[in-house]
Amino acid sequence: MILEPVTRTTWKALPPRWTTRQKRPVDHIFIHHGATLLGDHTESGEARLIRSYQRHHYNKVPPWADVAYSFLVGIESGRVYTGRGWRNRPGATRRWNHRSYAICVVGDTTRQQISQQAIDSVRALIAQGVARGYIAPEFHVKGHRDVASTECPGDTAYDTLNEMRPLRGQVAAPKIIAPPLGKLLRLRRPRMRGTLVRGVQANVGTADDGVYGPHTASGVKIWQASNKLKVDGIVGPVTHKAMFDAG
């Protein structure tokens, strides 16, 4: 199952107030629900409700950084939306955010039945996270109520947690093969692109779009600093060797 999440731009998200980089891989995925009935199962209807979630989280006291969830999934359609995404720490599961991702079912899964499409999307999303190195190969899928005094993620979602977990063989630990170093990778215009950029992005945990932009350069600097290398945001022979030959 190939997932193409609806982007934040498409669902008209407000920009985050701030972001906190998530450490990876995490070993927990928590399932939530919005606890609000969803009557319009079109993309525009789901997006409207997701925007209301974001406004609600913005208006918390103290205010939250963004919509709390990493990803959101339509209760009937199974359509996937990007929340904070893989790169940023979620804010939905108190005391667990530093070691988990949060997936929210858009709707109320006690008063509404979660669909097989939604279950399949959650399972595929988790498998994608493992394959890309964001989720550890050994992980736990839990409901919010397992770690907090709440009815979340609703009854029909909670009853299907086992179905949301990918089977062994459906997921595999990421294997990053070192692409050869040709030109030095650096931030410039036109942007540098290609397989090597994707390999770098997989290592540093930035968006895997294959484009060496500001976020990737920033991720490389953080990676270089943590590995006691010269911090310049450039992938040259030393950084390339350390990044791909470390194991």
Residue ranges and their predicted role:
Residues 230-241:
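Short, charged early-sequence alpha-helical segments and their helix-coil boundaries
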Residues 44-60, 64-66, 72:
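Glycan-recognition patch characteristic of GH18 chitinases/ENGases
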Residues 1-36, 40-41, 48, 67, ...:
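Basic/polar, cationic surfaces and motifs that engage anionic cell-wall
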Residues 169-214:
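Acidic, Ser/Thr/Pro/Gly-enriched interdomain connector segments
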Residues 110, 207-208, 231:
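Residues marking the start of alpha-helices
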Residues 204-205, 226-229, 247:
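Short capping motifs at secondary-structure boundaries
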Residues 156, 210, 214, 233:
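Acidic, glycine-anchored loop motifs typical of Ca2+
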